[in-house]
Amino acid sequence: MPMDYQTEKHRGFAFVEFEEVEDAMSAIDNMNESEIFGRTIRVNVARPVRIREGWSRPVWSDENWLKKYGSAPLEGRKLDEPDIVNPSDTSENVEDLSDEEMRTKKQKRNLPRVFFDIRIGNGDAGRIVMELRSDIVPRTAENFRALCTGERGFGYHNCCFHRVIPQFMCQGGDFVKGDGTGGKSIYGRKFDDENFQLRHEGFGVLSMANSGPNTNGSQFFICTTKCDWLDGKHVVFGRVVDGQNVVKKMESVGSKSGKVKEPVIISRCGELI
């Protein structure tokens, strides 16, 4: 890029992609504020973006992205805010809706969607797309969304489903130990139950695993049947909207004890537009 003549700083960009989050964070620690050919360089995480399915174009190929985020430090950046729905774009007469109803409709139109690409054994099983109820449990939904994108430096990438019980659920999210005894949230190790408004009403429900009241971390489960006995004990925060067949494939390698016959891995994850 051209030199900034106000500050007389030379500006340029370089991007390095790492397979493991830990390797990327170590590289940042080692290289940030280091000196190359007499010039100090700044190294941080490229701002994560929401992607469309099948879209693999690197963020730095977008000129607008470079102008907006290339020279800004990671700290202090705001995450993407949901689009505001223009009432004129809806088919309903907005004059017939109360303010509360309008807010509810806008929130529902802007619910975040995230995805898991699942690998079972050595083969790709497919993609699961999940919709998060940020309108009802915003803290819980944001925790899951951020762990899907990995924007905090840790998350679900390469995490396993360590416990799968047919006709019950598939549990995962322990990216610390991988056996159901670890995990952490974006708010610290644990956070409180937000509310129990949503119910375990059937196949595809997303809910937080816990070890008692107010012990939510990163572990979660996907219901494969109605689990109403869990209502009031586990916080429901979303549902599977696509890839139900992939969940069934995962369920098929489970057992009554929960031990999986083949490894079930989240090979890739993120947020969809």
Curated annotation (Swiss-Prot):
Q: What is its EC number?
A: 5.2.1.8
From the UniProt record, list the reaction(s) this protein catalyses.
[protein]-peptidylproline (omega=180) = [protein]-peptidylproline (omega=0)
Alphabetized GO MF terms: cyclosporin A binding; peptidyl-prolyl cis-trans isomerase activity; RNA binding
What the entry lists under Pfam families is as follows:
Pro_isomerase, RRM_1
Record domain PPIase cyclophilin-type: where: 115-271
**This protein's record includes keyword DNA-binding:** no
Q: What is the similarity comment for this entry?
A: Belongs to the cyclophilin-type PPIase family. PPIase E subfamily.
What is the protein name stated in its UniProt record? Peptidyl-prolyl cis-trans isomerase E
Identify the species of origin.
Answer: Schistosoma mansoni (Blood fluke)
Tell me the classification of the organism that encodes this protein.
Eukaryota, Metazoa, Spiralia, Lophotrochozoa, Platyhelminthes
